Amino acid sequence: MSDDVQMTSAPTLFLLMAQYCGKTVVPLDVVCRDFFGHLTERKLLQKCLRGDIALPIVRIETSQKAARGVHLSDLASYIDKRRAAAIRERDQLCGPQ
């Protein structure tokens, strides 16, 4: 099991499973709308492919036209990592809570 999957907290993953009705892969446009509303879908894809946003994009087929999405475990891991970074930043500014 990779470290990324191990870092995912069960509550985050379970909440996302409930939010997306148990889907394994969430369409990229939905992820964009729900979590990256300040970006267009195209800009989100570019940032992910460049590595600016560490979120793996899944294509079900090798075709360039295949639908793109984000695996639920990857999304949960990304959210948990962003939360951990925010907590570290807060603790540096305000001291541990």
Where are these regions (language model features)?
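Positively charged, aromatic-accented nucleic-acid-binding surfaces
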Residues: 1-21, 63-97
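Polyanion-binding surface elements
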Residues: 12-43, 78
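Helix N-cap / beta->alpha transition motif
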Residues: 27-28, 56, 71-74
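Major-groove DNA-recognition helix of helix-turn-helix-type DNA-binding domains
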Residues: 35-69, 85, 90, 94-96
